[in-house]
Every structure is written in C-alpha cells, then in structure tokens.
Amino acid sequence: MVISWTNEKITIPVAWKIYKKDSGKTKLDLAKELIRYCLFTLRIQPQAFLFDSFYASESLLKYLIKHKQLFYSQIPKNRKFNNIFLSKQHNGRPYWQETGVIRGGVKVQVVKNRRKYYVTNNIGITRKEQLQTYKIRWNIEEIFRFVKQELGFERCHSQSLDGQNTHFGMCFYLYAILQDIAEKNQMTDYCIKLKATLDKNFANQLVLPTLSGSA
C-alpha cells in the first residue's frame, strides 16, 4: 500500500505500508496511518486525497472530514445514498449528479458516469471537474505498473519485513529519481529506459538531480 503526491507533471511515492493479515491491522488502519504521516509528520497540505472504492469506508471518510481534507473516490453501486441503493437511483439513468448522504451521515456529491459512481465532499463542483479530478488517480496506477515491469518490484527474495521494506523503498526511490529526470528532460520514464538500454552513453547526456548528504 502506497501513498503518493502528484502535481500532474510528476508523481512521487511518499510512504508505504506492507499489509500482513496477522498484524492485527486492517488495510483501512494502514491507510489512516499513511494519511496521518503525510499530514502531521511530513506536513504536506494536499488539495485532496484520491483513492479507489475499497477505501471509501465510513471511518476513513469521516477521518478525512475531521481533519478538513477533501476526498474523491469511486464508490460501489451497492452502497446506499439517501437511504436508497445507488443502483436504484434515478430509474437507472446512466448519467446524473446529486448531493446527499451515504452511510454514517457523510454528506457527499455523487456523480454517476455510465455504470460507475463517484463521490466527493467538495460539494458544488461541476460533474466534469469531479470526474477529471478523480482521473488524476491514474498516476498512482502508473507507479505500480512501472516499478513492477521495469524496476523489479515483485522480485524481492527476502523473507524478512526489513528486507522487503528496503527493496520496496529502493524501487520507489528510483522511481522518484526517474520522475525528476523525466520532467527535467521532457521525456517519459519508459523513453529514458529505452534510450539508456540502446545507448550506453545516454545517461551522461541527461540533466540529473543533485543529491547531497554525507555517507
């Protein structure tokens, strides 16, 4: 599980947690820990939190509202909205937008787009704004695709939690560096990897980030 920051030009993995069934913590517990770390340790002030429907639980949404944070999420069709199942709203019309409450009395704005439902507590924005904002979450999916395909994310042989954390951390760190290089050189991560594979001198031509610190 990873929480990332993006300005839509670059996307940086900020922190992560490894979920273990026997730890006594749920995925929602870990999600709250990551949010807390970003808000109160790193003191990041995000414009909003974006996540998929699994995390759109009453407890997590209320946690974000408590800390005055905006959220955008997809939501399952079997959730109730104004005490009626989403799938039964508006006679099954494929497109609509309405403000109301979901479980726990959480006030949200719901947008239906074809067969999918989206919620936000940023009440009053347009349907287009809500859908476009949620689409930014695709940047997170791109992180996992790239680190799995290109950086060996799933090829960790360590059985220890520390070893796995080190491996995942290195993958995310390399991804962040590649994002910085890609932005400075106006190239994609994949293009950088391809050129570096074909031209051994290519790395010397790049504008690289400056790293500081003592060993």
Task: Please describe what each predicted stretch is.
Residues 126-158:
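Short amphipathic alpha-helical "interface-anchor" segments enriched in bulky aromatics
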Residues 153-206:
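Basic, amphipathic alpha-helical segments enriched in Lys/Arg and hydrophobic/aromatic residues
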Residues 3, 48-54, 71, 118, ...:
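Short, conserved catalytic/metal-binding motifs centered on acidic residues
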Residues 102-133:
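Long, acidic, intrinsically disordered low-complexity segments
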Residues 8, 55-57, 77-80, 124-125, ...:
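Short, solvent-exposed loop/turn segments at secondary-structure junctions
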Residues 210-215:
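Long, charge-rich low-complexity segments
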Residues 1-11, 68:
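Active-site-proximal, Lys/Arg-enriched surface segment
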Residues 16-114, 185, 190-194, 198:
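An internal, acidic/charged active-site-proximal segment
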